[in-house]
Amino acid sequence: MAVISMKQLLEAGVHFGHQTRRWNPKMAKYIFTERNGIHVIDLQQTVKLADQAYDFVRDAAANDAVILFVGTKKQASEAIKEEAERAGQYYINHRWLGGTLTNWDTIQKRIARLKEIKQMEVDGIFDVLPKKEVALLNKQRARLEKFLGGIEDMPRIPDIIYIVDPHKEQIAVKEAKKLGIPVVAMVDTNADPDDIDVIIPANDDAIRAVKLITSKLADAVIEGRQGEDSVEAVEAELAAGETQADSIEEIVEVVEGANEN
């Protein structure tokens, strides 16, 4: 059984790519057709490749891999945080700071500063400091939490990075490639898939699409860490909603109908 059904992908709008003039020709093999100036992603490939991504992440998680979820665009920010936390993993959902991976020692120093400020409050030091100084410390803490809070407890450089929109997160992709870290990514029709190790062709601009794919990869982590029993509910949900388009022609009919509305 597929991890994500065709019906789920269609309902979440995973099939809608970018305008044809914004495409990357390297994504041609993942594009089914063009409708009204929009590329339509081949969801039969998405189903297959999502399965491969799920298995890859699950198997890595079973071996205690550290997985970093990355998505800083507004459509991805909330889902990245929620699903990474649900899976007991780590995330960056605001701006990617250059050197997050390649200059990990410096990043760790900033994380140590964040923890130091938090501990100062716990120890009651804030109570004896001037209000102006406390305000400055709180401002510093807020900024550090915004950019580093999701990796505050990450024990080491991640073993895998999952990225929503590698076109936007090019710095993260380059750092991962430099360090030999595998990248799993939602790749839209405007992106370059060459540096992505595990590709999931998908609309990365729709909140529902991002949530769907990201939640399934979080499920993969949970299954890998806890065993198949932990995802019985997920499988039951899939079985209940397994009615799906059986052919690529049916997908086109659905897509054309959606475009006309």
Swiss-Prot record:
Gene3D superfamilies hit by this protein: Glucose-6-phosphate isomerase like protein, domain 1, Helix hairpin bin
Coiled coil: none
Keywords: Ribonucleoprotein, Ribosomal protein
Transmembrane segments: none
Pfam families found in the cross-reference section: Ribosomal_S2
Gene Ontology biological process terms in this record: translation
GO molecular function, one term: structural constituent of ribosome
One GO CC term on file: cytosolic small ribosomal subunit
Entry-linked PANTHER family: 30S RIBOSOMAL PROTEIN S2 PROKARYOTIC AND ORGANELLAR (PTHR12534), SMALL RIBOSOMAL SUBUNIT PROTEIN US2M (PTHR12534:SF0)
Family, similarity comment: Belongs to the universal ribosomal protein uS2 family.
Name the UniProt record assigns to this protein: Small ribosomal subunit protein uS2
Organism: Streptococcus mutans serotype c (strain ATCC 700610 / UA159)
Phylogenetic placement of the source organism: Bacteria, Bacillati, Bacillota, Bacilli, Lactobacillales
Gene: rpsB
